């Protein structure tokens, strides 16, 4: 088995989408970075890698058994064992995983560039491990939705833009749940004032579909202003907004 040593990790907990596991250039000063003293390195086939990075489902039992208590974390000058922690790659992409004792990839992290390069060199001529895992298990039941957007609608955005876009869609999801035509018409007019007259005869569903389809792609100053208006007066959303706008990228 291959091992990495002195690996810096920045855990993102409960993330089912790989796009929310930030690469090193998006790590922040307030992130809690840890040092893994030793961690197993696994090379797997791309379908299994996708399943690990972009889901929170059960990991293959044989994979978990192969890494059991082979990782150590160094904290406050102490070296402590981790039950199921490993770095996995398909030879192209790389992610670190810690199940915190469960059988699903609860915590995920990218590596720093120097250690990513080391991974590529170590696995270059290594055959991908075959785990007892049926292809059917790879067919995850996961579906993208308004609170878990498809990657194509997040691709290319910065960490801050991703977080604010997800906040905006949390507010939109709440708006959709109200099923109030006057409310949706008001907010669509805020987004696209030029359509004020055209939407007068439209149903809630028609206006909602237009608003969703026009806001789903990209991120702009218009998105930012719209998001700020939508979350105003809602303490939970305002707190998330403030946290994101106070953060500075390293």
UniProtKB/Swiss-Prot annotation:
Family: Belongs to the UPF0736 family.
Protein name: UPF0736 protein BPUM_1067
Record organism: Bacillus pumilus (strain SAFR-032)
Highest classification ranks of the organism: Bacteria, Bacillati, Bacillota, Bacilli, Bacillales
